[in-house]
């Protein structure tokens, strides 16, 4: 099996992102309760949170914060 990848991501609102994966699964993930710890502190600001990009097969923010696609698909 190939590695799981996020292929597309759209900001929905609040701390929610609609994600598409390379295994034909798509879902809206609510990150509100996932933003624990210092690395994710900037993402608690919705204006910062919505400025993500796809890098290394997942979503990433400018501060280097990211989530493994395997984790995201199970949320």
Residue map of PLM features:
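Motif-centric detector for short Cys/His coordination patterns
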Residues: 1-75
């Amino acid at each position: 099996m190939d590695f799981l990848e996020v292929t597309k991501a759209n900001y929905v609102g609040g701390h929610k992102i609609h994600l598409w994966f390379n295994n034909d699964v798509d879902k809206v993930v609510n990150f509100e309760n996932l933003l624990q710890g210092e690395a994710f502190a900037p993402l608690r600001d919705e204006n910062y949170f919505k400025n993500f990009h796809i890098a290394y097969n997942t979503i990433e923010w400018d501060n280097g914060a990211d989530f493994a696609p395997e984790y995201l698909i199970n949320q």
